[in-house]
Amino acid sequence: MDFFYIGVMSGSSLDGIDIALLKQDDRSRLVATHYIPMPEDLHAELLGLCSSGADEFARAAIAEQKWCKLVAQGVQTLLKEQNKVVADIRAIGSHGQTIRHEPARGYSIQIGNPALLAELTEITVVSDFRRRDIAAGGQGAPLVPAFHEALFDDNKDHRAVLNIGGFSNLSLIESDRPVEGFDCGPGNVLLDAWIQSQRHESYDKDGAWAASGKVDPELLKKLLSDPFFLTKGPKSTGREVFNLGWVHHHLFQLPTLAPEDVQATLLELTALTITESLQTAQAVTKELLVCGGGAHNKALMKRLAELLPDTEVNSTEKFGVDPDWVEAMAFAWLAHCCLEGVPANRPTVTGAKGRRVLGAIYPA
């Protein structure tokens, strides 16, 4: 039987909200999309909630109402554009907006007010996907490897799927073993933060600014010494660890560097931590499929290809899947798994004690 779901994803980059309409039968097919750029005031509010401050509960409640109302408007626009009505949609899978992720301390916080979203859209909402895995001893992240496996496993070739959003994570898909996956480290988060602080640009288009600089070996060595990079998976990370303050902490110990050289070094950090993660996992992979915003960073894609000469590096576009929409599709699929009672975490990815059904249901 065919079902339609809507997936909503707002990632750690805080640049916008992705809304995807998914048709789900024996496979997942992207039908349509809608993108909402993050308003500057809401971006600032959400970023402020990623670190400790005054009156956090009230600030979070106000911010999530704004976020939720934006999503509801986006869902209504998408339905109208596709000549769909509320009754056509089985559920919305809403990831929410992560403001803290500290699985070692037993929590991951996503705001988004799924109850209000169900009320405003009159559609059942599935949300809160991470906490059940954490309750079972897992990292609660990454959650997309199971979807990567469903989408890209052809039972023939060994391949890896790399998502480069604010942070980068890998899914290792081999036909003769369970899917594995983990966070590698910063994806775009430091690149975006640095260019925003130095040039007041939202991101480094095509990686052009990074390409204009030179990698500084001393800075790179200091960045790579972070304990996270020495830890084997399962592992996940977030802005609590990698942020602009972390970059400045390491820069403070060095002579002044040209801003473009810092950007080049941050890009090298992203590329190296991805390729070293692949090597540490001893993954036998012929192909690396890249999704997320980082797939559009030409300098980063070029560097990955240079560091992985025996691996074909491609965008997921090769499989007819737009790299910008894989994560939103994944949360639509996770909503489907929840309603069907299908466990969707992977203990080989998160370290949980077992398979669990993920998500909390807010009926329409």
From Swiss-Prot:
Keyword vocabulary terms for this entry: ATP-binding, Carbohydrate metabolism, Kinase, Nucleotide-binding, Transferase
Principal EC category: transferase
A single GO BP: 1,6-anhydro-N-acetyl-beta-muramic acid catabolic process
UniProt EC number: 2.7.1.170
Lineage top rank: taxon: Bacteria
Known function: Catalyzes the specific phosphorylation of 1,6-anhydro-N-acetylmuramic acid (anhMurNAc) with the simultaneous cleavage of the 1,6-anhydro ring, generating MurNAc-6-P. Is required for the utilization of anhMurNAc either imported from the medium or derived from its own cell wall murein, and thus plays a role in cell wall recycling.
Family of this protein: Belongs to the anhydro-N-acetylmuramic acid kinase family.
Catalytic activity from the UniProt record: 1,6-anhydro-N-acetyl-beta-muramate + ATP + H2O = N-acetyl-D-muramate 6-phosphate + ADP + H(+)
Listed name of the protein: Anhydro-N-acetylmuramic acid kinase
Pfam families xrefs: AnmK
Amino acids binding ATP: G11, S12, S13, L14, D15, G16, I17, D18
Lineage, broadest ranks: Bacteria, Pseudomonadati, Pseudomonadota, Gammaproteobacteria, Pseudomonadales
Pathway: Amino-sugar metabolism; 1,6-anhydro-N-acetylmuramate degradation; Cell wall biogenesis; peptidoglycan recycling
Gene3D superfamilies tied to this protein: 3.30.420.40
Alphabetized GO MF terms: ATP binding; kinase activity; phosphotransferase activity, alcohol group as acceptor
